């Protein structure tokens, strides 16, 4: 028997049958979480064809993309189109017998936060959902990937998908993570190195002492943003940290079933002599806090660096891309990244809206005020995260510093609700994408860790968070 990677083992264990000699298989899917934005046409297709949902109990419907995050929670959408999506979503849940986490549900939140809170993600699972950041679930030793609307319809009806097997990439991250650096900095470093298409056609497995040292929530950030390199899957072998994190969650097995599950989950790893199609090595020793300066997550650099000079790029297509990015972002080649002035600071999203992210933000903000010209918004990843942040006293720190403390939702990660930037606004953002218009038409986005966002809000411009913290914090 040949040695296998963890990715190959997960795909093999869920393969119903091989479909051809080109790597296509019929894949069984354990779980799916659907949102109000990408699923409506799929349910319409079921109705038109007179089909039912094969296993409603393996699905969760969750409202997160278009809902308001105003401090006083309500379920009225300001956009008529958004209201229509939500109303139809509720109808689909009722008609097809699928559990719905509605806007006012105490379990509501961003799908990739809610799923692990409710114990819906378990090691060894294969999970598909109508959102590209489903790769997040790799932090638990599961294979997660995003699918399109037609695939959602097929999944609802059959519990299966036609799936093309991916190549494998091993990303080894060694060394101790430096002071004030985080998982966000690791993944931005990876993106800078391999590019926005460097993992296209691959499933990534993250390994190494730096990965083992990360918390489970840090690993979620890492796997969440692997898709920004083109990866259609990102996995970290589960360990005791994962098992402790998921223990006692609502949908987790209990008693003897839990012990049996642990025995199985403990075997989930790549074979020692497994061969990967590609290997990337990162040493954390010289890693610094990272920020993006351009219009793609791979257009990034260390906060101590400068905006690049396009004329120094020998590849004409890459040079053109640099020029386009600088024009849209309104930046001058050679300027210090820490001199970039911001108008907004946003903390939240499925990348960095969890409780550990908010604790890191509170360390920076405690006893400080944000700059008078900056509007700061913090949106917890779920209603449960919001409650916990309030119980820990974090919310009081945010409010005292001048941040708006909101209800949960996708919010300003994407311009699909009422939290939208105006043309020319510049935002330090703890999200995952900085494409033109992502946070609003003509708006400019700089990605960074939540702590870096908090530091920028205080300074009024991009700044090295290390200057605001004491080593050891």
Swiss-Prot record:
It comes from the Bacteria. The keyword Metal-binding applies. It catalyses: (2R,3S)-3-isopropylmalate = (2S)-2-isopropylmalate. Its cofactor is [4Fe-4S] cluster. One of its GO terms (molecular function) is 4 iron, 4 sulfur cluster binding. Keywords: 4Fe-4S, Amino-acid biosynthesis, Branched-chain amino acid biosynthesis, Iron, Iron-sulfur, Leucine biosynthesis, Lyase, Metal-binding. Pathway: Amino-acid biosynthesis; L-leucine biosynthesis; L-leucine from 3-methyl-2-oxobutanoate: step 2/4. PROSITE patterns: ACONITASE_1, ACONITASE_2. Catalyzes the isomerization between 2-isopropylmalate and 3-isopropylmalate, via the formation of 2-isopropylmaleate. Heterodimer of LeuC and LeuD. PANTHER family: 3-ISOPROPYLMALATE DEHYDRATASE, HOMOACONITASE, MITOCHONDRIAL-RELATED. This is 3-isopropylmalate dehydratase large subunit 2. It comes from Salmonella typhimurium (strain LT2 / SGSC1412 / ATCC 700720).
């Amino acid at each position: 028997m040949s040695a296998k990677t963890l990715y190959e083992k997960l795909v093999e264990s869920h393969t119903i049958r091989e479909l051809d000699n080109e790597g296509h298989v019929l894949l069984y899917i354990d779980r799916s979480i659907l949102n109000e934005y990408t699923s409506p046409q799929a349910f319409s297709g079921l109705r038109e064809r007179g089909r039912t949902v094969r296993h409603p109990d393996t699905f969760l419907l969750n409202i997160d993309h278009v809902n308001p995050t105003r401090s006083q929670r309500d379920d009225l959408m300001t956009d008529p189109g958004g209201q229509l999506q939500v109303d139809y979503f509720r109808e689909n849940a009722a008609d097809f017998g699928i559990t719905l986490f509605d806007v006012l549900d105490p379990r509501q939140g961003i799908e990739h936060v809610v799923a692990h809170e409710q114990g819906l993600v378990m090691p060894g699972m294969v999970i598909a959902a109508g959102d590209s950041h489903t790769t997040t679930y790799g932090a638990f030793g599961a294979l997660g990937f995003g699918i399109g609307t037609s695939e959602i319809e097929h999944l609802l009806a059959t519990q299966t998908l036609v799936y093309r097997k991916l190549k494998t990439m091993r990303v080894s991250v060694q060394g101790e993570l430096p002071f004030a650096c985080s998982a966000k900095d690791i993944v931005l470093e990876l993106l800078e190195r391999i590019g926005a298409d460097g993992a296209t056609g691959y499933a990534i497995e993250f390994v190494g002492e730096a990965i083992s040292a990360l918390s489970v929530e840090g690993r979620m950030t890492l796997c969440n943003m692997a898709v920004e390199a083109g990866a259609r899957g990102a996995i970290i072998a589960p360990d005791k940290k994962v098992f402790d994190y998921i223990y006692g969650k609502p949908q987790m097995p209990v008693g003897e079933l839990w012990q049996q599950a642990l025995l199985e989950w403990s075997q989930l790893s790549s074979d020692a002599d497994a061969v990967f199609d590609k290997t990337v090595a990162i040493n954390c020793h010289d890693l610094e806090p990272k920020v993006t300066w351009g219009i793609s997550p791979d257009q990034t650099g260390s906060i101590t660096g400068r905006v690049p000079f396009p004329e120094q790029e020998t590849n004409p297509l890459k040079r053109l891309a640099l020029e386009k990015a600088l024009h849209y972002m309104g930046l001058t080649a050679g300027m210090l990244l820490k001199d970039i002035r911001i108008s907004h600071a946003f903390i939240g999203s499925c990348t960095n809206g969890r409780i550990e992210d908010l604790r890191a933000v509170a360390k920076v903000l405690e006893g400080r005020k944000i700059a008078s010209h900056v509007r700061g918004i913090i949106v917890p990843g779920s209603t449960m995260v919001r409650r916990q942040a309030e119980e820990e006293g974090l919310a009081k720190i945010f409010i005292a510093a001048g941040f708006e403390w909101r209800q949960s939702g996708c919010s300003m990660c994407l311009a699909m609700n009422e939290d939208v930037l105006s043309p020319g606004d510049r935002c330090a953002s703890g999200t995952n994408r900085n494409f033109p218009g992502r946070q609003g038409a003509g708006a400019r986005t700089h990605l960074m860790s939540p702590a870096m966002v908090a530091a920028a809000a205080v300074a009024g411009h991009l700044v090295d968070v290390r200057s605001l913290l004491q080593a050891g914090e």
